[in-house]
Amino acid sequence: MTGTRARRTVVSVVVSAVLACGTACTAGEGPAPRQSASAPPGPAARTSRPPALTGPSADALRSVERATGRAGSARVESTTVMGGELSLEAVGALGWRDDGLTGTLTITYTGGTTAETMRSLGTTAMEARYLPDAYYARMGDEFADRVGGRHWIKYVYEDLEDLGGGAGAGFADQMRKTTPHQAVKALLTAEDVRKVGEETTRGRRTTHWSGTVGGETAQTVDIWVDDRNLLVKKVERGRTKTGELTQTAYYSDYGVPVSARRPPAGDTADFKELLASQSG
């Protein structure tokens, strides 16, 4: 009985940890994470007032927003640190269209308490697949042995919205809004946005912009833009309940073909099913 209870506890912790990892990979790429769980829906709040920025700077950033949005996809390399809870690296390609986010990332845990939890199950990295309606995470063999041999955990966004406490709802909204040009949209609402200057970023001439967004839960957003009005680099800094949040992302190969296949149904466990089994 004790062994069964311990197994259930581990499974529950991992299901939550994997959700946190999926959030962390993209946490800095849009305004959604800055909302509290109890706040009104994000899109209404963002459209209730006009952008704070006007003039030549606004025109320049809107050109970046349009160009990045039209590109539709890019290769991504990112590092994320969330206080003492989690640090990770992610590499892959993501696409953004009207129907949402798609793509595949390889996520490597590099530190923090969440990483320690995953390492205890023999998992130091995972594959994450983002589809318009769901997020999938591939675990290792040791975890699969605990859940009937299935390696993939499935998180349907609509189901996440029903989670208690509001955390799932924030994740679902974030996944639908996660694109590089969301950072530009955020800067267009910043009152202190400024052009820092011209810099070389990964061997390319770029223009550096910086500003503070998010109101009471302010984050600093910095972007570096090339001569095609495409983001080359983005850095976001702020605070979370677990400490300082810092994410650095690099973008390249805009327009790259992106695909993400659904894992085999027989090798996939729905997160709701896994959580429900904890009370059985």
Please provide the spans of the model-predicted regions.
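N-terminal leader/targeting segments and the immediate start of mature chains
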Residues: 2-102, 272-280
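Extracytoplasmic
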Residues: 69-73, 98-100, 123, 130, ...
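Short, hydrophobic/aromatic-rich segments at coil-to-beta transitions
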Residues: 70-77, 99-104, 115, 202-210, ...
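Beta-turn initiation residues at beta-strand->coil junctions
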Residues: 78-80, 106-109, 139-141, 235-240
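N-terminal beta-strand/beta-hairpin edge segment
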Residues: 89-137
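Acidic/charged, solvent-exposed loop-and-adjacent secondary-structure segments enriched in E/D, K/R, S/T
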Residues: 132, 136-178
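A short, amphipathic edge element
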Residues: 185-194
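Gly/Pro-enriched, hydrophobic low-complexity segments
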Residues: 198, 204-266
